Curated annotation (Swiss-Prot):
This is Transaldolase. It comes from Gloeobacter violaceus (strain ATCC 29082 / PCC 7421). GO terms for molecular function: calcium ion binding; transaldolase activity. It holds the Pfam family EF-hand_5. The keyword Transmembrane does not apply. HAMAP family: Transaldolase_1 (MF_00492). The keyword Nucleotide-binding does not apply.
Length: 389
């Protein structure tokens, strides 16, 4: 008997849980886990984690003082909350957790460095070795340079929002610990651009990750490849053998429920024998290739905006929760603002493209799985009552 796809995948690839839901992590027992503002936002709405949110807000208020504006307290609380969830996750997984730098700093090298140092300091103050934490940074040229400096300080980085081979090469040359190429978002772009569907073996996201993996193994780079943002288990099957794959709970369930033979598709020995041209990636070459790669440039910009929107939404939720804790009631106003932040065209629905956050969060909120989030669904998801005009 071959066993489940998930069990077989674990024999050739490190499986990472793409969620902030601690109970889901306990269910699937991954080695590592990743978080981002969208995942933290979803987890923060779950009743079982409300005490973590409340304690974090109270700590941030005490740290900044009674005169500090709620927005400032919420911003500080986000950093603290990301670490608080990270600590809970690290009590379960044997490996590492990825914690994300504010996406609004994506083009600011110095600010990214300072934020990375701050996050690591918080983990170390809680008794966690920096070896168990990856700092997630967007794969801009400025972000890659920040990661290079952090890596020199022993702070390991996960470069995210990676869509082009040029980004991957720059990360490897910078000595980054790990990259997260976004398989599903690459597929989304090509489907929209061409109007056609793709079989898993020809999926542009799968092809991109395969190319990056083979390049790394051919030239002996130590940077690990962690495929991310999957749309279906077919993509995962085609990347069996990749260093790591970060997978949402929904797809982990499908892999666990599917019994079929899993064939390894990515292999370092095979990659070493391929004929591949080596490219030196200085800033001029990076910027030229990025400008020429419309998919990568559009998806990077979109991803940064999406993570920024998720962070803004989370900060609004935290500010509202703080107001409730301090005796002010503003939940409905905050909810309306959050819904309109994501409903870009004002049609009363949030599509997956408008959401631009993590697929796991979208799927959790999209209760009827029709590809659109209504005001009622978002209201249920964040515990608010929808009273939009």
């Amino acid at each position: 008997m071959t066993g489940s796809l998930l069990d077989q995948l674990r024999q050739m690839t490190i499986v990472v849980a793409d969620t902030g839901d601690i109970q889901a992590i306990e269910q699937f027992t991954p080695r590592d886990a990743t978080t981002n503002p969208s995942l933290i936002t979803a987890a923060a709405q779950m009743p079982q984690y409300q005490q973590i949110v409340d304690d974090t807000l109270k700590q941030a208020r005490a740290e900044l003082g009674p005169e500090a504006k709620a927005a400032a307290v919420a911003t500080l609380a986000f950093d603290r909350l990301a670490v608080a969830f990270g600590l809970k996750i690290l009590a379960i997984v044997p490996g590492r957790v990825s914690t994300e730098v504010d996406a609004r700093l994506s083009y600011d090298t110095e600010a990214t460095i300072e934020k990375g140092r701050s996050l690591i300091a918080q983990y170390e103050a809680a008794g966690i070795s920096r070896e168990r934490v990856l700092i997630k940074i967007a794969s801009t040229w400025e972000g890659i340079r920040a990661a290079e400096i952090l890596e020199d300080e022993g702070i390991h980085c996960n470069l995210t929002l990676l869509f082009g081979v040029h980004q991957a090469i720059a990360c490897a040359e910078a000595g980054v610990t790990l990259i997260s190429p976004f398989v599903g978002r690459i597929l989304d772009w090509y489907k929209k651009e061409t109007g056609r569907d793709y079989e898993p073996h020809e999926d542009p996201g799968v092809v991109s990750v395969t190319t990056i993996y083979n390049y790394y193994k051919k030239f002996g780079y130590q940077t690990q490849v962690m495929g991310a943002s999957f749309r279906n288990i077919g993509e995962i099957v085609e990347l069996a053998g990749c260093d790591l794959l970060t997978i949402s709970p929904k797809l982990l369930e499908q892999l666990q429920a599917t019994d079929a033979e899993l064939v390894r598709k990515l292999d370092p020995d095979q990659a070493a024998g391929l004929e591949i041209e080596k490219i030196d990636m200085d800033q001029a070459t990076f910027e030229k290739r990025h400008a020429e790669d419309r998919m990568a440039s559009e998806k990077l910009d979109e991803g940064i905006k999406g993570f920024t929107n998720a962070l803004v939404a989370l900060e609004k939720l935290l500010a509202d929760r703080l107001a409730r804790l301090e005796g002010e009631v503003a939940l409905n106003q905050a909810f309306e603002s959050i819904f309109r932040t994501f409903d870009l065209d004002g049609d009363g629905f949030i599509t997956r493209e408008e959401w631009m956050g993590t697929d796991a969060v979208f799927d959790a909120i999209d209760l009827n799985h029709d590809g659109k989030i209504t005001a009622e669904e978002l209201g249920a998801g964040i515990g608010a009552v929808s009273k939009l005009a």
